[in-house]
Amino acid sequence: MNSARNILRTERLMLREATSADIDAAHAIASDFEVVRNTGTWPWPPDRDFTASRCQPIPADKGLGGIVARGSQIVGMASVFGEGELGYMLARAHWGKGYATEICRALIDLTFADGRWDRLKACVFTDNPGSAHVLLKLGFSEGSACTGNCASRGQELPTRTFTLDAPGLERA
């Protein structure tokens, strides 16, 4: 039995801490190049040790997030980490169902309520319009273009940047 702590629930999904019991399911997701090509840090070919490093609870001072599940089925991962960067990946079978928007909206609400970050950011490779669309639906504003490293593709790629301020925050 998985004793991971639940972080949040939505109508259809749950976000809970990742544990070593999640390695096989997370590695199956990371074994689809079409998924990891849209991430900055996940390697290709898939590396089980890297997956295992991501399948452990995130220390509270480092971020918030973990495994996205629908019932007992793991559908992906989502987190806010570092300097308030939102990251997520879903198994391809679960693209186009609104899961990314649903879990990220709840994670954003929890993150701002938590008070550790007053601004979130996200970076999306320009050839990943689906994630850019999710961020815009979530209220993110698009910033300047830049480049970002893509471990799975082994190169720097053109990147779109997005930011979202906490409700009520006024910036000078």
Across the structure, where does each feature detected by a protein language model lie?
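Acyl-donor (CoA/ACP) binding surface of acyl/acetyltransferases
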Residues: 1-38, 65-172
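A generic alpha-helix propensity feature with a strong bias for hydrophobic helices
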Residues: 46-49, 60, 161, 170
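Short loop/turn motifs at secondary-structure junctions and domain boundaries
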Residues: 56-62
